[in-house]
A protein has these predicted regions:
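ATP-dependent adenylation/nucleotidyltransferase module used to activate substrates
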Residues: 1-118, 188-190
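Peripheral terminal appendages
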Residues: 25, 68, 85, 89-98, ...
Length: 192
């Protein structure tokens, strides 16, 4: 509901370009709204961003189980945003069953822009499309969370049930046609 089709199309175009430099990647669109709402209504606002990212990691791990991926890969860049500080990345990593690889972690903005221009993703990444990440963003994000504090917040939530609810609203997106195949249909479990 908060991810416009134009954003899915933009990400699909970028994924197609990236597939020229890697094995054939797949695009999964996960609806985090159930988790975001519960976090917004239940947890301290300053921890929202880290909690959202931990849910993304938990869901990505479930998708990785199905695709047999041995690691997760992100475009995180140290210090770029509140969730990408060393303390917060460590807390986010703790939610993962797999290594999280961050090839851009030490790049500065100019390096990242130069790389994007070289591989052909710069123009596409500049497209102005509303982003779903800002809908529930806190005004006071914590830049130095601890695992203990985050686990206290998560204790207020039914994390496994929320992950399942988000997965039930996840789909694999065909990069060319944008056709969506629901998670339950992919996994043979329509009642995820």
């Amino acid at each position: 509901p908060y991810t416009p089709p134009a954003l899915i199309a933009k990400v699909a175009r970028l994924a197609e370009v990236l597939n020229d430099f890697q094995g054939k990647g797949q695009l999964f669109a996960a609806n985090l709204l159930p988790a975001q709402r519960m976090i917004r209504d239940t947890c301290r606002s300053r921890y929202r961003t880290v909690l959202y990212r931990r849910f993304m990691v938990l869901i990505a791990n479930r998708i990785a189980d199905w695709t047999t991926a041995s690691a997760l890969l992100t475009g995180d860049n140290l210090g770029q945003v509140a969730s990408q500080t060393l303390p917060n990345m460590a807390v986010i990593d703790a939610a993962s069953e797999r290594m999280i690889i961050r090839p851009l972690v030490a790049y500065d903005k100019q390096d990242t822009v130069a790389l994007a221009a070289r591989i052909g993703t710069l123009e596409g990444s500049k497209e102005e499309v509303p982003d779903s990440c800002t809908v529930f963003a806190p005004t006071d994000p914590c830049t130095s969370s601890t695992l203990r504090a985050i686990e206290r917040e998560e204790a207020r939530l039914d994390v496994p049930a929320l992950v399942e609810e988000c997965l039930a609203q996840t789909a694999r997106v065909d990069l060319r046609t944008l056709a969506e195949t629901p998670w339950g249909q992919l996994t043979g479990n329509d009642a995820v």
